[in-house]
């Protein structure tokens, strides 16, 4: 029990752990003898179906289930999805709400909302593992599908006390003014697709300052004109993110770029200069880069001058000798990064560590590929694509 209580992140526990807990408390046949606090602690780690079954056992159990936050991994709200389980053969306006109870098991449900005249039609798909188990169809009279879908999603946020770990919002006009969301203090992964900076700001302000993963997108038709401004990029959630990808123009300055803490990131450059990228590489070479750095993808057609970017930096070109010595690595790298100039830059602090710089007409990629390894007391470099 102590081991479960001390988990830094809540999760759905394994069958073995539930069995151990059941033995510890004397099995569920002794459930009625447990005090309320102990019952609540057990409830926190039950899956959704088990909670539903328990809630119909008695009025007191129903009350406990209703006041105990449910564990939810991710909530997703998507605008105008296609291929909606044969709901229609044509595209139509809809909202899909997905609730995932586990990151990897596929245990989830999906609810599709769409408008038919004055009524909202709903299809509810439940999944256990990776198989669809059941489908329900409903009609809500005299209401709006957009409003009802958001209310439904936010109701599930409330059920888990807004403590889910991941959120994915892909909506053009999320009703922020009428929203009940105030804080997402435990959310560590956030994906937002929006057409304005105000929506990005509204969601980021509700998240912790240090995120594991952040992704910002806009409509595909806007990606070459929509720009995330420099002042917005000072958000702590951006500066401290472990991984982030912005699928639109992003006006990072060189200073902001050099102070990022992300191990993996990518964005469309607006203000980044060759000097800024040169300084970024030199920081890594001299041991001042981000610890355990993995990948930086910089999309720009203006920053393809390898001479300016690599000045003052020692490197090894991928010549014939290198390609023969590291044939497996080079082949794997070339599958992901096609035609373009590729060079290897070695750390001055540890020569067994290196990064690959890849230049293409519209991308500069900086990727940690060489890693120190020791086998049979012999130290060597192992090259691999992260």
Curated annotation (Swiss-Prot):
Domain F-box stretches: 29-76
Annotated Pfam families: F-box, FBA_2
InterPro entries referenced in this protein's UniProt entry, alphabetically: F-box-assoc_dom_typ2, F-box_dom, She-1-like
Domain of life (superkingdom): Eukaryota
The protein's name: Uncharacterized F-box protein T20B12.4
